[in-house]
From Swiss-Prot:
PANTHER family: 50S RIBOSOMAL PROTEIN L9 (PTHR21368). It comes from Orientia tsutsugamushi (strain Boryong) (Rickettsia tsutsugamushi). This is Large ribosomal subunit protein bL9. One of its GO terms (molecular function) is structural constituent of ribosome. The keyword Nucleotide-binding does not apply.
């Protein structure tokens, strides 16, 4: 039985895929649960036009996400919070707070998959702006602005040290 998937089905296919399945699986599982429709000529025409519209919409979404990525990629966001003497936060910084501080336009949905940040310092976070567009930002958590500046200085020096090590490794492999 040939069917067109209208919802993603694990181990079978994604939306708008044309699949060939056993008659019983199609009649008893996919069709009643509205996971698929029959692959008739009329439905195939509709799917082709829908796929084209979705691809155009997807390209616009990617372009908008890349424009936002250019603005926020490798940027620093500072949070001034109360911490204990050993650098543990009283509370935590969640993905929701980070997204709110990023102030991304409402037409783009940012997604951050992290555990809540509970320690002071600089944390690297990956932000997904689209399924195909990702960028990294740095979260600077400190007790005060001066402490935040110290963390930035330490981070920049460690970054320069790693860059120097990479250059040494590249030069040694050339010799």
């Amino acid at each position: 039985m040939k069917l067109i998937l209208i919802k993603p089905v694990k181990k079978l296919g994604k939306i708008m895929d044309i699949v060939d399945v056993a008659n019983g699986f199609g009649r008893n599982y996919l069709l009643p649960r509205n996971y698929a429709i029959r692959a008739t000529n009329a439905n195939l025409e509709i799917v082709k036009s829908t796929v084209q519209q979705l691809n155009e919409k997807n390209q616009k979404g990617i372009a908008a996400a890349q424009a936002v990525m250019q603005k926020i990629d490798r940027s620093f966001i500072t949070f001034i919070c109360q911490t204990s003497d050993d650098g543990k936060l009283f509370g935590s910084i969640t993905a929701k707070e980070i997204i709110k501080k990023l102030q991304i336009s409402s037409d783009i949905k940012a997604y951050i998959d992290i555990k809540p940040i509970k320690t002071a310092g600089i944390h690297e976070v990956e932000v997904s702006l689209h399924a195909e567009v990702h960028c990294k930002i740095f979260i600077n958590v400190a007790r005060s602005n001066t402490e935040a500046q110290e963390y930035l200085k330490k981070f920049n020096t460690s970054l320069q040290d790693t860059n120097n090590n990479v250059l040494v490794e590249k030069n040694s492999s050339i010799s």
